[in-house]
Amino acid sequence: HQNEKALADHEATFDERFVHWSQSAETGTSWEAMDIRSVSASNDTKLVLQRDSVIQAEGKLGKTEYVVLGKAGGEALRAIRLEALIHDTLPKNGPGRADDGNFVLTEIEVRWAPDSDPDAWKKIKLHKPQADFSQQNFPVKNAIDGNKSGNNGWAVSPQLGQYHSALFELNEPIVSDESYQIEIKLTQHYQGNKYALGRFRLSITSDEGEIDLGIPLTIDSILALSADERSDEQQQSLKTFFEGRDKQLLQLKKALEVAKKPRPEDPQVTKLKARLELVSQPLP
């Protein structure tokens, strides 16, 4: 009962904490959706650019490379964020195309070229990778280690059917007075052949100092509205997102689950039951 009470007490303050958070949300690094000019994929996979810079993968499953070409310029570009998004058209809601909703990002590569010399591509080194979650043996640092073999990369099992994000800082920021093209290549060569991203979005930041994953662009745009401008659906999206970030709530739920698990029966009791059953059987 102690665990149930702790959970109930915590849930009772949910509305108060939620309102406080939604009014003064510390959103961290400010991310901006990439201005995308074209998307393509190898191996008969089709990438479809949707609104809000969301990219959805369709068509044939297989080892593939996604190439996203965008435009940038003005402020220095310091980091790139990849959001892995869920959707009901994907197996188990995704965010990957594998049967269980997983994906394996083998490698992410970035290069850029100034508009005045569009063939003068310069490769950019990435470092300081971060992710909200990494599968055991598939840490996010694998996505920038240069190894494109079939069992290496960033993946997110068992946290499937959930939003995930990763960021990669540029070794040296791109600083250009004129606008330029930026190309991001996502290689997905996992040996299972199905482990590609199903739905994703790329964002960039020019923030200086410590860079963090920030919050999803969709949540960011809802937070920009005042409470009475938000639809019920938008308000619910905020609540779901806030719940997912409530570490204490997750810990309390876990403690309650553990407490509710039936305890294994004492072997002596099991033996006694078996003997009683024998004794109580009618004689022939």
Regions of interest found by a model, annotated:
Residues 1-284:
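Low-complexity, glycine/serine/threonine/alanine-rich intrinsically disordered linker
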